[in-house]
Amino acid sequence: MIPDVSQALAWLEKHPQALKGIQRGLERETLRVNADGTLATTGHPEALGSALTHKWITTDFAEALLEFITPVDGDIEHMLTFMRDLHRYTARNMCDERMWPLSMPCYIAEGQDIELAQYGTSNTGRFKTLYREGLKNRYGALMQTISGVHYNFSLPMAFWQAKCGDISGADAKEKISAGYFRVIRNYYRFGWVIPYLFGASPAICSSFLQGKPTSLPFEKTECGMYYLPYATSLRLSDLGYTNKSQSNLGITFNDLYEYVAGLKQAIKTPSEEYAKIGIEKDGKRLQINSNVLQIENELYAPIRPKRVTRSGESPSDALLRGGIEYIEVRSLDINPFSPIGVDEQQVRFLDLFMVWCALADAPEMSSSELACTRVNWNRVILEGRKPGLTLGIGCETAQFPLPQVGKDLFRDLKRVAQTLDSINGGEAYQKVCDELVACFDNPDLTFSARILRSMIDTGIGGTGKAFAEAYRNLLREEPLEILREEDFVAEREASERRQQEMEAADTEPFAVWLEKHA
């Protein structure tokens, strides 16, 4: 089932320096909660400055949903320590609140009013909050409070030059973009390995169902927790953060211009369903527009091609301008066993897997084959640890045992690991391979199995509160290592100044400005 990568691996072993200079970055979301696990109703902590313009700490959907962002980094340890510093400073500056350590929220009552993230009075800030109002009215606020980790990854120019020859200008844009689309297609075909290993949401609180019927065969504990015994990541299931209305958009990942055209079409295509919500009610705007996507960021995807945008530029226009610059992996649940929601083992595994995805052949995929890849993902998400589970290739009928496919993949990853270790020194990547490959013969070692054991004992709420309390105490005590207190104070002041400048620079009323941007 795994493509034959032997020639590409032999090429890599002859060109190990092609992997010198991999760049990455991390984003981690987490809900602010009270000691009893309920959602914090306070505003964004003052010490964290402006959520609109802060470089490292912002908010996602809700005012209580923090998002930590590391700068681009070539050093894994430095990046993780930077992320930990963001958590340490925040833990010391959120009064009696904690950071929820799980992807799935728990103590949120049906119909509870969840305050949307607030970004001040600038047109840009108001637009961001209105976008979130649209998300709430389309999908419900509860779904939007699910948290995850995003891993951003780029291969060095040396890799593309070794692989594609001496490239520059438009030629580089085309070839590098084609290379990253290969990564994305392989990710759709084989990325289910990520929830298998690291999925950590095998259960949900009963409040999450909100009384809606479900066809999933949940088991229920006495404390009202619903779980699937072999599930890995309900966050990635249809119960979690996915979007059925987008499944027939037909967006493909074969060609830059085709992809961008599909995305631009989706933000112009009217939706009958969303038109029923209306645009405005009693003088209050309900969504930016009633199209299938309000803006491009609404497209739900487990992986995204990205380029840093310039001021006023849409993500797709940035891609058209310069091609794909990096990949954003979006299938990681919060790691409940780490105070910062992600750890070194995961980052090293993702490095290996992304390099493998760049090397393995990836035939072009139609939108129907893309839909077929979802079958494997759903199997792993809902019953990934089930004995005897099999997976298929695309829309073909042949089935292969998951443990065997996993071990075949890791045989390749071990060779990538040897190459990365040869240029970085040590055996850190090979050690990760040895640790993780054991999960295929013993699913009890996976994150989902480990966290489910705790959840069955103490419930999701009990597990979440215990981890949150332990991490709060730990982070508050740890000294900063890379950033200093004065760096945070300076960024707080600079972010507030940037927000004020944006507000002062606006000359048009929001309604007029919105007509041009909706």
Swiss-Prot record:
Its EC number is 6.3.2.2. Coiled coil: none annotated. Pathway: Sulfur metabolism; glutathione biosynthesis; glutathione from L-cysteine and L-glutamate: step 1/2. Gene3D superfamilies: 3.30.590.20. GO terms for molecular function: ATP binding; glutamate-cysteine ligase activity; metal ion binding. GO terms for cellular component: cytosol. InterPro entries: Gln_synth/guanido_kin_cat_dom (IPR014746), Glu_cys_ligase (IPR007370), Glut_cys_ligase (IPR006334). One of its GO terms (biological process) is glutathione biosynthetic process. Pfam families: Glu_cys_ligase. Keywords: ATP-binding, Glutathione biosynthesis, Ligase, Nucleotide-binding. It comes from the Bacteria. It catalyses: L-cysteine + L-glutamate + ATP = gamma-L-glutamyl-L-cysteine + ADP + phosphate + H(+). NCBIfam families: glu_cys_ligase. Belongs to the glutamate--cysteine ligase type 1 family. Type 1 subfamily. This is Glutamate--cysteine ligase. It comes from Escherichia coli O8 (strain IAI1). The gene is gshA.
